[in-house]
Amino acid sequence: QYKPAIVRGNASEIIALAGLWGLEGEAADLSRVRGVDTTDTVDAARDAAVALARYTGGAVVVSGEVDLITDGTTVAKSHGGSPLMSKITGCGCSQGGVLAVYACAADPFTAAVCGTAVYNVAGTRAAAVADAPASFKVAFIDELYRATAQDIADNQLELEEA
């Protein structure tokens, strides 16, 4: 009866979830999850993400080197972040909290795009001043705090039809 406004996961998680909900047929069997890590690519999860977004009527975020965000009609790709983000336990999970904050103030797709952009901006800036996981984590939190609406607007974003 109640469907999520925003779903966020790595490529393998999104493919598996679409499979569990019967949206992608064999996709869940093809997904390669290793704990919370993924061996699937963001591009491989595109169809599953679009199907999930159409099913929920919300937005889906697939995190990766270039994040994919879709509402089932439009696909956005958000650039930025840092490879160090994958070295921080819970970094992907905490993105869910950031997305939830934005979801309180905007429609699901806009919230997902803005929340992902601010995450990528913070990751890029933190990587410029930190070169190891512990210092990166502190710098990342500081950069989330410092991010502005203009930073979100300046984040590199590609848009295409789903």
Predicted regions and their residues:
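Short, small-residue alpha-helix embedded
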Residues: 16, 87-117
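Conserved phosphate/ATP/ADP-binding segment of small-molecule kinases
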Residues: 1-75
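Glycine-rich phosphate/pyrophosphate-binding loop at beta-loop-alpha junctions
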Residues: 70, 74-80, 115-131, 136
